[in-house]
């Protein structure tokens, strides 16, 4: 039987050289490496306590079918919603019930590129520490703040009170390029198949859409998120 890995409620498993070299040292809890990998890449393990394991053991503890030879347990990052919302003119992505690990990973990576201040997610969104998510972030998971919350309706209300303008990605919205994102901004993105729930859509201040040509009705969540945050970034460039 396949192993479920070594992670627990406080720590998560991260694999592969690319991801390993992205982990900030303060989050590293334990490092495992195969002897061959260790001998070949000694320089990346400087000043680290590394447990060497056989290829067989590495295969058993790995989440992938063909492990690269290095695996780390990392302490989970902890951020607070209150701290995130206190930032000046922040830019957020708010995700409701997103299920695809690749989508979430790409959203984090694209979000980092566009300079977002954080990702806020409903509890029924896919686990950000899912190995597929972690891998597809290419290290952004360690640099983009994120929180899971119980109630996105409450978050939308709090944002309104803090003068953060909330936007719902919605088929009945106005063209997203016609809005002004230079103030505090939060883009709400819904589940891949169903979009945002009606309740949350009604709570959010404005509806926006990405115009489509041909017979395409909508883009996937990751691509839509990317277009929205990069439009916000474009508008904010050169603005204090």
Which positions does each model-derived feature cover?
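RNA substrate-binding interface of SAM-dependent RNA methyltransferases
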Residues: 84-172
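Alpha-helix capping/helix-boundary segments
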Residues: 18-20, 37-38, 57, 125-126, ...
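Short active-site loop/helix that positions an aromatic residue
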Residues: 20-27
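Short, charged/polar "capping" segments at the starts of alpha-helices
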Residues: 35-43
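Single conserved hydrophobic/aromatic residue that forms the stacking wall/gate
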Residues: 1-6, 10
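Structured adenosyl-cofactor binding patch, chiefly the S-adenosyl-L-methionine
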Residues: 113-114, 128, 132-141, 198-240
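Active-site/ligand-binding-proximal alpha/beta "capping" segment
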Residues: 167-215, 220
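Glycine/small-residue-rich loop that forms an oxyanion/phosphate-binding "nest" at active or ligand-binding sites
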Residues: 50-75
């Amino acid at each position: 039987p396949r192993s479920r890995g070594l992670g627990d409620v406080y720590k998560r498993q991260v694999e592969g050289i690319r991801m390993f070299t992205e982990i900030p040292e303060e989050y590293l809890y334990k490092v495992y490496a195969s002897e061959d990998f260790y001998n070949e890449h000694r320089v990346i393990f400087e000043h680290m306590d590394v447990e060497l394991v056989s290829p067989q053991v590495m295969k058993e503890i790995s989440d992938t079918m063909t492990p690269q030879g290095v695996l780390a347990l990392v302490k989970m990052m902890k951020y607070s919603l209150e701290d995130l919302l206190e930032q000046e003119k922040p830019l957020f992505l708010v995700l409701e019930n997103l299920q695809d690990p690749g989508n979430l990973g790409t959203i984090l990576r694209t979000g980092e590129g566009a300079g977002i201040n954080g990702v806020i997610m409903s509890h029924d969104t896919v686990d950000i520490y899912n190995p597929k998510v972690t891998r597809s972030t290419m290290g952004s998971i360690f640099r983009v703040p994120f929180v899971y919350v119980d109630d996105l309706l409450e978050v939308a209300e709090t944002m309104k009170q803090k003068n953060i303008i909330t936007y719902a990605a919605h088929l009945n919205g106005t063209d997203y390029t016609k809005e002004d994102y230079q103030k505090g901004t939060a883009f709400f993105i819904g589940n891949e198949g169903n979009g945002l729930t009606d309740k949350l859509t009604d709570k959010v201040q404005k509806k926006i859409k990405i115009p489509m040509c041909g017979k395409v009705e909508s883009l996937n969540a990751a691509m839509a998120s990317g277009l929205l945050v990069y439009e916000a970034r474009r508008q904010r460039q050169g603005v204090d």
